[in-house]
Curated annotation (Swiss-Prot):
Key words of the record: Aminoacyl-tRNA synthetase, ATP-binding, Cytoplasm, Ligase, Magnesium, Metal-binding, Nucleotide-binding, Protein biosynthesis
Organism: Saccharolobus islandicus (strain Y.G.57.14 / Yellowstone #1)
Subunit structure: Tetramer of two alpha and two beta subunits.
GO cellular component terms, semicolon-separated: phenylalanine-tRNA ligase complex
Protein name: Phenylalanine--tRNA ligase beta subunit
Binding site for Mg(2+): 321, 327, 330-331
Length: 545
């Protein structure tokens, strides 16, 4: 959910209804209203409904439910003489721009709208950043988006003197927060007039030159980012909501210098979504018709036509939450009102049961305890230096370097546990079951989840045979007659380790820990370890059932 704060009276004045009616209609849109004080209300909105993050967007939606306006909102659009030249900006390659004339907006609300978009579709400015400028203060009709050196100077927003970009990164709050997103190789993305004056360095900060004030009615809007689709959608949402406030949208010519391509911005990205009448009836459990379905779609501010018996919904640019047929059905439910949908009776009763892998893991844990081992539990995250493989999932922004990777084996965690418990009474026999993430080139992500069990013994004197016997007992108790094939790796002593096979399928590894590995973990006593691949064991046992 996304929370916005609006002036209650300004919002009610746009739709001419009472507060209780407003709350009821917003509830239909899956939003909740909470009073803050006499003048202001707090509204919780679903994070996918970006079009509702301002009072004008809410007013547009409610006018549809009240049937004051039906179908897609129509706005005045005109061509302008403004041009945006997009150069090769390596860290944020995409940029679009638009003009909005004569929009009557609340400045505080516009800034809130901008920041809520930054936090949602913008992913805290990493994916998309928005610059909103006072058009009166833009001196050039040709604007360029390009890389500039960090020595470039301009007066940052609310500043009173020129600073270099390097100084902005060091001295301003925005520079400290967002500088690491886009700065690379000593250059920064920048929106620049044709005379070289900087208007903004996205996603960090605007220039004070084009600062908005209460008298601003004409806007130059730039949107930059790492995803062209997200940039286009964000610009469409902003200009649509400003146009809802009485503004006229001005197109900007966008030229891509790298390939000389040209387009007109904003793009107003529409899509056609076909909806089946029977599908709507099935999902909502109602009796309806194509005409009734179209009526509800129009109430949700989308266009709807029936062509050759097919319901065709035209999704406007501001409804980026509509991805497929089920999203349209959800909108129909909102138009009808969830309270007006009759709950259906249960036509069958089903009983849940444990997943087979859960039962298998439970059985393996019981066998481990029965074999004299104590169960421990480590974190799934681990320090990458403790891993033995170089193919693992790295955490991009870890809270601490102690947990900067996802484990691909349970063995490092057991060794770490042994290193911290060398003072305990010997022998130490411990085991763990849990999830790991292993490299797998056949999957979409290159990795897959795997379930494993690992066993360790540490004593003054311990050998391969000490771990092999209980492992063989556990596997035999599961109904598996396994073979052990000598295989060497960097964890175990050469000639004192093996892989565990069942019918030519590898089920685990076992061996005496290499002294170099013991030294690496600070362990002063010999240790033996085995790791079983529960996921593979489960597949084989399932085939035998």
């Amino acid at each position: 959910m996304v929370t916005i704060v609006l002036n209650k009276y300004k919002l009610l004045d746009k739709i001419h209804i009472g507060q209780q009616k407003l709350e009821d209609l917003l509830f239909n849109l899956k939003s909740e209203v909470k009073p803050i004080d006499e003048n202001n209300i707090e509204i919780e909105i679903n994070a996918d409904r970006l079009d509702l993050l301002s009072s004008d967007g809410i007013a547009r939606a409610i006018k549809g439910l009240l049937e004051k306006e039906l179908g897609e909102a129509k706005y005045n659009v005109t061509d302008t003489e403004y041009t945006l030249i997009v150069d090769n900006v390596r860290t944020r390659p995409y940029a679009l721009a638009a003009i909005v004339y004569n929009a009557k907006i609340d400045l505080e609300e516009l800034i809130q709208f901008q920041e809520k978009l930054h936090g949602t579709i913008g992913r805290k400015r990493k994916k998309v950043a928005i610059g909103i400028h006072d058009l009166r203060k833009v001196d050039s009709k040709t604007i360029e988006y390009k890389e500039v050196p960090l020595s470039y100077k301009f007066v940052p927003l609310y500043g009173n003197k020129e600073l270099t970009i390097s100084e902005i990164l060091e001295k301003t709050e925005q520079g400290k927060l967002y500088g690491n997103i886009s700065i690379a190789n000593g250059v920064s993305p920048a929106i620049v007039q044709d005379d070289g004056e900087v208007l903004s360095i996205p996603p960090i900060i605007n220039s004070n030159k084009t600062r908005l004030d209460e008298n601003t009615k004409d806007f130059f809007i730039d949107v930059t980012g790492t995803s062209f689709e997200a940039v286009a959608q964000t610009l469409d949402i902003i200009v649509s909501n400003l146009a809802e406030a009485g503004g006229t949208i001005g197109r900007v010519k966008v030229l891509k210098s790298a390939n000389s391509s040209q387009l007109s911005s904003p793009l107003f990205l529409h899509k056609i979504q076909n909806v089946r009448e029977e599908y709507v009836k099935k999902i909502l459990g109602i009796k309806t018709s194509k005409e009734e379905i179209c009526k509800h779609v129009m109430r949700m501010r989308m266009n709807c036509d029936i062509e050759n018996g097919v319901i065709r919904v035209t999704v406007p640019q501001y409804r980026v939450d509509i991805l497929n047929e089920i999203d349209v059905v959800e909108d129909i439910a909102m138009s009808i009102g969830y309270n007006n949908l009759e709950p259906s009776k249960y036509i069958s009763t089903n009983y849940g049961s444990y997943d087979y892998m859960t039962l298998l893991e439970r059985k393996i844990r019981e066998l481990g305890i029965g074999a004299g081992y104590v169960e421990i539990s480590n974190f799934v995250l681990i320090k990458d230096e403790k891993l033995f493989s170089n193919k693992y999932v790295k955490i991009l922004n870890p809270v601490t370097e102690e947990y900067n990777a996802v484990r691909d084996s349970l063995i490092p965690g057991l060794l770490d546990f042994l290193s911290k418990n060398q003072h305990a009474k010997f022998p130490i026999r411990v085991f763990e079951t849990g999830d790991v993430v292993v490299y797998d080139s056949s999957t979409d992500t290159g990795f897959r989840n795997d379930k494993r069990a690992a066993y360790a013994i540490m004593d003054n004197k311990v050998s391969y045979e000490d771990i092999q016997a209980p492992i063989h007992y556990i596997l035999k108790s599961l109904g598996l007659e396994v073979n052990y094939k000598e295989e060497n790796n960097n964890i175990f002593i050469e000639g004192r380790s093996a892989s565990i096979f069942y019918e030519n399928e590898k089920m685990g590894v076992i061996g005496e820990v290499n002294p170099d590995v013991l030294i690496r973990f600070g362990i002063e006593y010999p240790a033996v370890i085995a790791e079983l691949y529960i996921s593979e064991i489960g597949k084989r046992l399932t085939n035998q059932r």
